[in-house]
Every structure is written in structure tokens, then in C-alpha cells.
A protein has these predicted regions:
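Active-site neighborhoods of divalent-metal-dependent phosphate/nucleic-acid chemistry enzymes
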Residues: 73-125
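Short glycine/serine- and small hydrophobic-enriched flexible loop segments
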Residues: 11, 44-51, 108-112
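Active-site-proximal, substrate-binding regions of enzyme catalytic domains
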Residues: 37-92
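Short, well-structured N-terminal submotif of metal-dependent ribonuclease cores
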Residues: 1-39, 49-62
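Short glycine-enriched loop/turn motifs at secondary-structure junctions
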Residues: 25-27, 69-71, 113-115
């Protein structure tokens, strides 16, 4: 089981340099955890690619369809008071943006407080 960041999900939806790595990781372990806003983050990335004309309208429609199918298959970590508490604590200890703290908190929550038990797939630089 791995927790997937949108930066690793988007390459499963459209061809990117990191697509082969994302696909290999998914084949190795098809159980996907994602936070409740992952779909919105992925949609934002797809919309940006379409606006920048890196993705045709037809390719974008297909990518959104793949996202819907993938979303239905992943395990989603919902926002809770506990998640908010962990995210707030992370912000006091680490230099993070709010959204990054929320996502990291979701991964920690999914790992039931034992982060080493769940892999984190992220291609952000």
C-alpha cells in the first residue's frame, strides 16, 4: 500500500517523463491511498496542461475519464479533526505550505501514526 501524491497520479493519466515509473510502481502495488483533495489537484494539473496546449481537448477528456475510474478505485483519506490537528502540528515543525501539510497529515493518518509502514509516491521537486 502506497500513498500517492497528485504529481505521481497525473503521469498515469497523461504521457509524461515520469509515466513509466508511475506505472511500474502501480503494478508493484495496486493498492492506492490518496487524500480527499487528490482528484481536485489532478483536475487542476490536467486543466493547466490543456490551457497550455500541452494536451488536446480530446486527450484531456480521456484523461478526465481515466481520473474518474482511478478515483473510484483508490482508497481516499477523508478530512477529519485528527487530520487537521496533525497538519497544524506539521506546520509548526516543518516549512510546509498548508496544502502540503494537509496531504502529509493524510498520509500519516492513513499509516495509523506509523509512517514507515506506508510508502509515499511523490514526484514533486
Amino acid at each position: 500500500m502506497r500513498f500517492w501524491d497528485s504529481s505521481a497520479i497525473v503521469p498515469l493519466l497523461v504521457r509524461e517523463p515520469s509515466s513509466p515509473r508511475s506505472k511500474a510502481l502501480l503494478r508493484e502495488d495496486p493498492v492506492v491511498l490518496a487524500w480527499w483533495a487528490a482528484e481536485v489537484e489532478c483536475s487542476s494539473a490536467l486543466a493547466r496542461l490543456e490551457r497550455d496546449q500541452s494536451l488536446s481537448r480530446k486527450a484531456a477528456v480521456s484523461a478526465y475519464q481515466r481520473l474518474a475510474v482511478f478515483r473510484d478505485a483508490w482508497n481516499e483519506v477523508q478530512p477529519t479533526a485528527g487530520l487537521k490537528e496533525i497538519a497544524t502540528r506539521l506546520l509548526r515543525v516543518h516549512v510546509l505550505r498548508a496544502a502540503d501539510a494537509l496531504q502529509l497529515a493524510a498520509a500519516i493518518l492513513a499509516a495509523e501514526g506509523r509512517p514507515s509502514t506506508v510508502g509515499f509516491v511523490c514526484f514533486d521537486e
